[in-house]
Amino acid sequence: MFKPSAHRRLPREDDIIQEDDEDGPLWPSALRRLSNEEERLKIADGDERKLFSAYPRGSMENRDYKVWDIYFTLGGDSLYAGRILKAVMKFPSSYPLRPPTLKFVSKMFHPNIYEDGKMCISILEEDKQQDSSVFGDPKDKWTPVQNIRTIVMSIVVILNSPNISSPANVDASVMYRDNPEEYIKEVIRIAREEDEKLRRTDPQAREVALQMKAEN
């Protein structure tokens, strides 16, 4: 009878993650998870639906769950109120063992967003990553219990309440600290221009704009 070697060990989660292919297809478990998240987002609380919309790429018959378009639609006294901001979220094959990445497509002028659109937020960081410009408590780093909703809601908080102690955009951080009135004008100007561009060029953004109008 075959006996397993005493020195043989079972694969650990770290081993599985290392084998993840960022450009490969989603694992079946990841596909199921993201499909379920899509359904939950459709029945989200009304107040949350007013803050963002999230859509996997592709048609209903041919979904690409690896890439999602995120549309932020903040209201109230936000500097982005009435505007649409777009970001793209990309998922690794092993999601949720590893976090997705998020990058703004809309041009942003914000202390916690790099000029290339990358977002600095602890919820998207793995334990092994050490980035001093990441916003958030280190205890809040990525775990598999996080999801699209928790990520986006964390970003909403940062958009409205920048943290200048660990900036990704130094110019935005300095202006926010030393010349807040000018910062407000610049953010509003850029948000308006990016919103107008999205509505002209992005069919999904136009659908989001119609939803915003219907809810107001």
From Swiss-Prot:
Domain UBC core: residue ranges: 29-196
Reactions that this protein is recorded to catalyse: S-ubiquitinyl-[E1 ubiquitin-activating enzyme]-L-cysteine + [E2 ubiquitin-conjugating enzyme]-L-cysteine = [E1 ubiquitin-activating enzyme]-L-cysteine + S-ubiquitinyl-[E2 ubiquitin-conjugating enzyme]-L-cysteine
Record bears the keyword Ribonucleoprotein: no
Active site per UniProt: 120 (glycyl thioester intermediate)
Region called Disordered, residue ranges: 1-29
Comp. bias regions, Basic residues: 1-10
Keywords: Transferase, Ubl conjugation pathway
Gene3D superfamilies associated with the record: Ubiquitin Conjugating Enzyme
The EC number(s) this enzyme carries: 2.3.2.23
Similarity comment text for this entry: Belongs to the ubiquitin-conjugating enzyme family.
Annotated protein name in UniProt: Probable ubiquitin-conjugating enzyme E2 ECU01_1010
Natural source organism: Encephalitozoon cuniculi (strain GB-M1) (Microsporidian parasite)
